[in-house]
Structures are given as C-alpha cells and as structure tokens.
C-alpha cells in the first residue's frame, strides 16, 4: 500500500488486508488466530493476548514477582464482553492456550519482559 519494502530479517506476522480496505471480501486464507504482545510497562501491565477461534487468553507477566503470573480465559462466542473468566473452570484449555501462545512468541522471536535485574521473564504454563 505504501510501496515500502520489508527490511531484511524483519519478522512480519500478519496478512495483507488491502482488499478489505477497498470494500472487498475477507481473504480466503483468513486466520482465526491473533497475537498481541506488549512486554513493556503500560499502566503497570506487561501482557500477551492470544486468541484462537472462540477462545481468548490474556497472560499477565509480573516483573515484581515473576513466579506469580496471572491469566484470564474467555470464550468470546459465549461471552463477547469478557465478563466471565474461565481460567479456573477450564484449566486444561488455559494451559493449551498458553502453550500455543508460547509457540507463537518463539516463532516470531518476541522479546520478553525483564525483571528488575534485567533477566527475561518467559511465560510459563500453569
């Protein structure tokens, strides 16, 4: 769209949706996955969001206490406003989503938040 090339060695995790901007149909290869990773402080939150199909996981890193991350899990089809955290009712699904999230973070070479000693805090399955 802007006519700018992608720098060598730069990972692009996305797909061309130019057609949608022009009023066209959704791409045939549309993915039902979405990763948003923010390993920096923003109002106290360091987080990764992983959506796969109807499920959405939000993983909160805790640089002050890295051994104590938090997670929330939603079924967006049944709960589009994210009112009901299912992470304790569906721990198997929460762990599955965390494993998928870790795989995608590793695949894209994502940076992890660091603790106050500068040590990376990778997500853990719990």
Predicted regions mapped to residue ranges:
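C-terminal cap/loop subdomain of S1 sulfatases and analogous C-terminal strand-loop tails that border
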Residues: 2-76, 126
């Amino acid at each position: 769209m802007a006519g700018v090339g992608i720098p060598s060695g730069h990972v692009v995790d996305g797909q061309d949706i130019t057609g949608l901007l022009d009023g066209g149909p959704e791409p045939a290869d549309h993915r039902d996955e979405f990763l948003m990773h923010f390993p920096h402080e923003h109002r106290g939150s360091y987080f990764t969001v992983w959506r796969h199909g109807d499920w959405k996981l939000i993983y909160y890193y805790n640089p002050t206490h890295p051994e104590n991350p938090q997670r929330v899990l939603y079924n967006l089809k049944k709960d589009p406003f994210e009112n009901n955290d299912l992470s304790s009712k569906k721990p198997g699904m929460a762990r599955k989503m965390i494993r998928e999230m870790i795989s995608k973070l590793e695949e894209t070479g994502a940076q992890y938040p660091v603790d106050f000693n500068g040590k990376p805090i990778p997500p853990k399955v719990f």
